[in-house]
Design a protein with these regions (language model features):
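N-terminal export signals
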Residues: 1-10
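Structured, non-membrane catalytic/scaffold regions adjacent to prosthetic-group chemistry
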Residues: 9-390
Length: 390
């Protein structure tokens, strides 16, 4: 034993290659480690055109509340336009006393406001409305939601400068992409907390997020936060555009379609462990996930490991912010038996996340918007985790 110890003490230390030579030079803009290249958005393109579709945030690979800009979900109706900011203008007109035009540079001179908000596509989670559960990752199923620090000019400041007519009650926003997305917003909301967003997480918003400027409507369905914003019309009635009649409406059981379901309901999802993951062995695991609500802040998240028979309250990461993603955590002792993991969120307005069955009862089977039902992951005895319905 003594000779072995002596040999170990005299053996040369083996250094890994990265400790024996200089590393990469300085760079103008940082990028993720090449070993993390698999952490990426998942694209879902339309069969009609590669420019129509969405890409989802890999929720299962992230921690904290902020989504990196390069992983923030995308949703486009006609691809990402290549806009020259020097030629781009925002026009405010209609029922105003003083029509206005703003260049990008002129808006950058206004006082800025920064807020942490989630953004969620109204179609997020539509795959969980399929008849049979899809075996896919958390991000693929639920990743049309992201959270950022948004910085820009309060819309109320610009509208006050334009002077609103007394009979006006709506604001109609139009994007400068080829689809010319048009959405109507009640003036009361526009004068409350809406931003003309110019920055995301400290840097200028990226093209897929609306460069050089986008409308940002906190807590409301993502499509009203019109990207590539170039026109705001103050009016006495909504535009009744295609995106307010043929799409982005909720199909009801009696065959009617309900318009203007703006606010995103309270929702939560366990991100780890989640779909397509594998638990190595029985033992203690941390069940972690995110919760959010367009009605306010998250007040409570409960977690179940037995398919909803019993619930335990999870810890919420501070600070808990209004209309912002909140991360929750709770330890779980897995005994190796099959389990069903679920989370249920309650917001500051008293709204409780419904079950999948409760959500489906409200709407027609063909409805694909505003799904906020409780989500479930099944854990097999082998440790494999998959999407299940409860």
């Amino acid at each position: 034993m003594a000779s072995a110890q002596a040999a170990a003490e005299t053996s040369p230390i083996a250094f890994p290659e990265w400790m024996t030579r200089p590393g990469a030079p300085l760079s103008g803009y940082g990028t993720p480690a090449q070993q993390e290249s698999a952490v990426a958005r998942s694209p879902m393109s339309s069969p009609l055109s590669p420019t129509i579709g969405a890409s989802t945030t890999p929720l299962e690979s992230l921690q904290g509340r902020i989504t990196p800009n390069g992983l923030h979900f995308e949703r486009h109706h006609s691809g990402v336009p290549n806009i020259d900011p020097a030629q781009h203008e925002l026009k405010i007109h209609g029922a105003v006393r003083r029509p206005l035009k703003f260049s990008v540079d002129s808006l950058l001179r206004y006082p800025m406001t920064s807020k942490f908000y989630f953004l969620e596509c109204s179609g997020n989670g539509f795959l969980n409305l399929l008849d049979n559960p899809l075996d896919a990752s958390c991000g693929t199923l639920n990743g049309l939601v992201s959270c950022s620090e948004w910085t820009g000019v309060r819309l109320s400041l610009l509208l006050e400068e334009a002077g609103i007519d007394a009979d006006a009650s709506w604001l109609i926003a139009e994007g400068a992409d080829a689809a010319s997305l048009v959405r109507s917003i009640p003036l009361e909301k526009a004068l409350d907390d809406v931003l003309i967003a110019l920055y995301q997480n400290g840097e200028r918003i990226r093209p897929e997020q609306g460069y050089p400027m986008r409308l940002f409507v906190p807590g409301w369905e993502g499509n009203v936060s019109v990207k590539w914003l170039h026109r705001l019309k103050v009016a006495s009635s909504p535009a009744q555009s295609r995106s307010e009649t043929a799409t982005y409406t909720d199909l009801m059981p009696d065959g009617r379609a309900e318009q203007f379901t703006f606010t995103m309901g309270v929702k939560s999802v366990i991100t780890h462990p989640s779909g397509t993951m594998n638990l190595a062995a029985p033992g203690i695991y941390e069940l972690a996930g995110i919760a959010w609500s367009g009605h306010g802040a998250i007040a409570r998240v409960e977690v179940s490991a037995d398919g909803g028979k019993s619930w335990a309250e999870a810890a919420l990461d501070a600070p808990v912010i209004d209309k912002c993603v909140c991360r929750f955590r709770i330890p779980w002792q897995w005994d190796g038996a099959p389990a069903t993991l679920m989370s249920r969120a309650t917001d500051s307005a008293g709204n409780v996340q419904p079950t999948r069955a409760e959500f489906q009862k409200r709407y027609s089977p063909g409805n694909m918007y505003h799904f906020n039902g409780i989500l479930a992951w099944g854990v097999e005895a082998s440790g494999r985790v998959s999407n299940v319905y409860v």
